[in-house]
Amino acid sequence: MGEKCIKRDCLHLCFSYMSGKVIIFPVESNTAHVKVTPALNKIFFSVTVCLRFLSDYNKEQAPGDGRYRLYIGDKGVFFYGLPTGLNQWHSVCVTWDSGTGLAQIWVNGRPSARKALQAGASIAGTPSIMLGQDQDAYAGGFHVYDAFYGHATDVHMCDTVLSPSEIKDYMKCVISRPGNVVDWTNMEYSKHGYVIQENITLYTK
């Protein structure tokens, strides 16, 4: 299925069937991003976010030592020893549960140790979901050294912790449980700045 777009105030507002599409952030920028409108507006006590990415980003701020960092609110935790190879597609799923406070990252089918992060907390208010930028403030606070520089696809977000079998399916490019907050195959979004959308068939996952 195709993409329906209108142009308003120099901004493309799209409602897209994104299956088979990839978003490219081709330059380091503090403006280029994709804003995603969530399908649910609620208080979140658990989440799973999955995506696939490819990049050759390797700066001092991202030393390429298998390190990933997850934030819930203003608290973060590092996960180590996971795949981060340059110019390779990586499938990533992140889970967090408020009840137990446990967070985990899966990369290319490999699960991290589960670590404590913000037990009893919640994610309240309208979610501000941005692809390509790190938000140091709600819907803003972008810095070029925090920006994503590369390709991204298959973004899904659920309001629950997916099971290991569901995550393993995702790692095999099988979407057994599409996101009910963000579903890459059917989401409303807007592109800002230098952002390109192409067919994933031009690349190798």
Annotate the PLM regions.
Residues 1-205:
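Extracellular glycan-associated modules
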